[in-house]
Regions:
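Active-site helical microenvironments for divalent-metal-assisted chemistry
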Residues: 1-146
Length: 146
C-alpha cells in the first residue's frame, strides 16, 4: 500500500471520533490539510506521511514504536520530533521549535497555519481565541526566523 494512503488510513482510524474546536468538523481534516500544505513544498512521501500522522502520538494511543514498525525511521523520527507533551509550557515550545529539523519545521509551520485558519470557527471564548492567536503568530515567526 502507498505510504501516504496508509498514513491517511491510520489517521482516520486514530482520530475517528475527534472533532476540531468548532465541535463539528472531523479532526482528521486537520492533518490532511497540513499534509496538503507540506506537499506544495516537497514530494517526499515520508515527510507527507509524517505530516498526516503529526498528531497521532500526541492525541491518541498510537506509539512511535508502532509508527516505526509500520513505516520507517524517517516517518517515526519526524512524528517524534513534533510530539510535545501537553504539560510543556508555550515558552518551551518556542525553544523546541527553533531546534526542529527543516522538514519538522515545514510540518509544524503548516500545522500552525491550519490552526490559525480554523481559529475563527473555534467554539471558544474570545479571550482564549485571542491568546491562542497570539501564541500561533509568535510560533510562526519563530519557525520562519530559523
Amino acid at each position: 500500500m502507498d505510504k501516504i494512503l496508509a498514513a491517511a488510513f491510520i489517521a482516520v482510524a486514530a482520530h475517528k471520533s475527534a472533532k476540531r474546536a468548532d465541535g463539528i468538523t472531523p479532526y482528521v481534516l486537520h492533518p490532511l490539510r497540513v499534509a496538503l500544505g507540506v506537499s506544495a513544498y516537497t514530494k517526499d512521501k515520508d515527510v507527507i506521511a509524517a505530516a498526516i500522522l503529526h498528531d497521532v502520538v500526541e492525541d491518541t494511543n498510537m506509539t512511535i514504536k508502532t509508527l516505526r514498525h509500520i513505516f520507517n525511521d524517517t516517518v517515526a523520527d519526524l512524528v517524534e520530533e513534533l510530539t510535545v507533551p501537553k504539560r510543556v509550557t508555550r515558552k518551551k515550545k518556542y525553544v523546541l521549535a527553533k531546534k526542529f529539523s527543516p522538514m519538522a519545521r515545514l510540518i509544524k509551520l503548516n500545522d500552525a497555519l491550519d490552526n490559525l485558519i480554523d481559529l475563527d470557527t473555534a467554539n471558544w471564548p474570545d479571550e482564549k481565541k485571542a491568546e491562542y492567536r497570539k501564541y500561533l503568530d509568535a510560533l510562526i515567526k519563530k519557525l520562519n526566523s530559523v
